[in-house]
Amino acid sequence: MQIQSFYHSASLKTQEAFKSLQKTLYNGMQILSGQGKAPAKAPDARPEIIVLREPGATWGNYLQHQKASNHSLHNLYNLQRDLLTVAATVLGKQDPVLTSMANQMELAKVKADRPATKQEEAAAKALKKNLIELIAARTQQQDGLPAKEAHRFAAVAFRDAQVKQLNNQPWQTIKNTLTHNGHHYTNTQLPAAEMKIGAKDIFPSAYEGKGVCSWDTKNIHHANNLWMSTVSVHEDGKDKTLFCGIRHGVLSPYHEKDPLLRHVGAENKAKEVLTAALFSKPELLNKALAGEAVSLKLVSVGLLTASNIFGKEGTMVEDQMRAWQSLTQPGKMIHLKIRNKDGDLQTVKIKPDVAAFNVGVNELALKLGFGLKASDSYNAEALHQLLGNDLRPEARPGGWVGEWLAQYPDNYEVVNTLARQIKDIWKNNQHHKDGGEPYKLAQRLAMLAHEIDAVPAWNCKSGKDRTGMMDSEIKREIISLHQTHMLSAPGSLPDSGGQKIFQKVLLNSGNLEIQKQNTGGAGNKVMKNLSPEVLNLSYQKRVGDENIWQSVKGISSLITS
């Protein structure tokens, strides 16, 4: 199909929008033609496409003048293809501009992958903006809207279509394995859609194999990005669970403007997290389904920065804490509807007890001190629930931990050590600084929860980046503990062996897949290089390998919400 063939039927503004889009896409991706051999597959790159600009140009001559990035061009192609699909749902699948572009992209495919150039990277980042401008130009042409109103409509329409596409794709269990020192570990991420007793998922408003992505910020019916995360080891001929917890996005439907709906939505999300927590405890779930009123302890660890200076996360934390408080009044029994093995909805009775923390882990919190005071006002109360009123490091633990230790369990030493470490961190405000370990308090709270048979749950705003790094830090320490029978000291960088474990976990924990599930591209936004360098957190030192660091970062910097 010739691009020129549809120019005559488009308005001048539509033509201008398309020309800009065409230039961005084609100049960025460089359509392949003429002579030359495609380069070999880039190390650790995940497959996709390639291209050139001028007839007769060859890869060798072209690449000599281009600075390569760390991103696979194939990954950029997949991202752009998905964005074109979203635009097509807004403009119509037969839109000539998008059809032509899609055809050109198909023609551009070659078998081998290579690192993208900086120009191609910039083009991929700009594509979404240009597609929205194209939609705005079409809207302005067809409906006669003012430019600003047309652009606002286009941005909302594109976002809604993208959220729908991400939600409606299959949400399936992610399972990866890694081996270290002869031990075989399995990391499993189970989405809400696959939390099943029978043929259907357990939730009253069924997911039906789909999900709720992190960008669905007005959803008041489901928790965002809800998964059960597990790490197990295969030994003595069977699989042994080393850790299990629930991960999700913030409970606040923060783009819902109606205060009442926002409150109802936060409670609904909290109920889904409690339902998932109950599902993670099969024996407790069976008792509840048999009609028994069961007590459910949950340690919720928010990872947001409790400040409204940037991003309004302070209000989101308030919404989340209010939801937990409304469901966990002393002695309060709540009723949850769960779909049983026959597919019927059944009411179960639970007495939820939630120790609700919030620990800022980004640069705003750990480098600039934003939100620390607000977070610690919640954390003090939650620590008293967990460890008792005497938080001196040398004091005997009380609270939930004291009750657990009174049984003299097999994991007495691990529980006691974790409790002491948490008290030390709290006393010295170590969680207010990076100190070589941004997640030092959050990670230990989750581990301690699991060790005392409570359910750990953790979340950031989206449930994918900070939440994903928390997931990886937990699994790194869990595997290290299994290997060495020792807990790391708070604020310590992993040694070479610990770094090897961390590297394997980062690439095989399922977090890259969850990020792609939510945005269309794999990569963790917490991996960044800021200027001045003093603002950077300690991830590069903790990971210990630049290539792994770049792989974990992925194409996150090219994705805009």
Swiss-Prot record:
* Entries under Pfam families matching the protein: IpgD
Q: Which residues form the active site?
A: C460
Molecular function as annotated in GO: lipid phosphatase activity; molecular function activator activity
GO BP field: negative regulation of cell growth; negative regulation of signaling; positive regulation of DNA replication; regulation of protein kinase activity; symbiont-mediated perturbation of host vacuole organization; symbiont-mediated suppression of host reactive oxygen species generation; symbiont-mediated suppression of host TRAF-mediated signal transduction
* A GO term from the CC aspect: symbiont-containing vacuole
What EC class is this?
A: hydrolase
Q: Which domain of life is it from?
A: Bacteria
Where does the protein principally reside?
Answer: secreted
Impact upon substituting C460S: Loss of activity
Compartments reported by the entry: Secreted
Residue numbers of motif CX5R motif? 460-466
Going by the UniProt record, its keywords in alphabetical order are:
Hydrolase, Secreted, Virulence
Q: What is its EC number?
A: 3.1.3.-
Q: Which family does it belong to?
A: Belongs to the phosphatase IpgD/SopB family.
Domain comment? Contains the consensus sequence Cys-X(5)-Arg characteristic of Mg-independent phosphatases.
- What function does this protein fulfil? Converts phosphatidylinositol 3,4,5-trisphosphate (PtdIns 3,4,5-P3) to PtdIns 3-P and prevents the transition of PtdIns 3-P to PtdIns 3,5-P2. It is one of the known effectors injected by Salmonella into the host cell and is required for invasion and for an efficient generation and maintenance of Salmonella-containing vacuole (SVC). Alteration of the phosphoinositide composition of the plasma membrane causes membrane ruffling and actin cytoskeleton rearrangements.
Descriptive protein name = Inositol phosphate phosphatase SopB
Its source organism is Salmonella typhimurium (strain LT2 / SGSC1412 / ATCC 700720)
- According to the entry, what is the taxonomic lineage of the organism? Bacteria, Pseudomonadati, Pseudomonadota, Gammaproteobacteria, Enterobacterales
